[in-house]
Amino acid sequence: MKITQEEVTHVANLSKLRFSEEETAAFATTLSKIVDMVELLGEVDTTGVAPTTTMADRKTVLRPDVAEEGIDRDRLFKNVPEKDNYYIKVPAILDNGGDA
């Protein structure tokens, strides 16, 4: 499946990213190769392979959910260039609060 430069540009715009024409062309080529590989994997005969089979021999180890003391707020805000009460002000990324 061929990914076009227009599709790369569209997704980049949704992500608020900008790329040069050369970068966009390179991304389109690379993404096309990745999609082709995924499609090729879809053709592999997995008859008799259990859906939950994994090659990794790992267990999920969860830690207990214990409240811990966080960062000292006043110390943190000493490094913040712009704040409003205890909120960190950052530049807007959406025009007029619009959607992505």
Curated annotation (Swiss-Prot):
It catalyses: L-glutamyl-tRNA(Gln) + L-glutamine + ATP + H2O = L-glutaminyl-tRNA(Gln) + L-glutamate + ADP + phosphate + H(+); L-aspartyl-tRNA(Asn) + L-glutamine + ATP + H2O = L-asparaginyl-tRNA(Asn) + L-glutamate + ADP + phosphate + 2 H(+). GO terms for biological process: glutaminyl-tRNAGln biosynthesis via transamidation; regulation of translational fidelity; translation. Its EC number is 6.3.5.-. One of its GO terms (molecular function) is ATP binding. Keywords: ATP-binding, Ligase, Nucleotide-binding, Protein biosynthesis. InterPro entries: Asp/Glu-ADT_sf_sub_c (IPR036113), GatC (IPR003837). It comes from the Bacteria. It is an enzyme of class 6 (ligase). SUPFAM superfamilies: Glu-tRNAGln amidotransferase C subunit (SSF141000). Belongs to the GatC family. Heterotrimer of A, B and C subunits. Allows the formation of correctly charged Asn-tRNA(Asn) or Gln-tRNA(Gln) through the transamidation of misacylated Asp-tRNA(Asn) or Glu-tRNA(Gln) in organisms which lack either or both of asparaginyl-tRNA or glutaminyl-tRNA synthetases. The reaction takes place in the presence of glutamine and ATP through an activated phospho-Asp-tRNA(Asn) or phospho-Glu-tRNA(Gln). PANTHER family: GLUTAMYL-TRNA(GLN) AMIDOTRANSFERASE SUBUNIT C, MITOCHONDRIAL. This is Glutamyl-tRNA(Gln) amidotransferase subunit C.
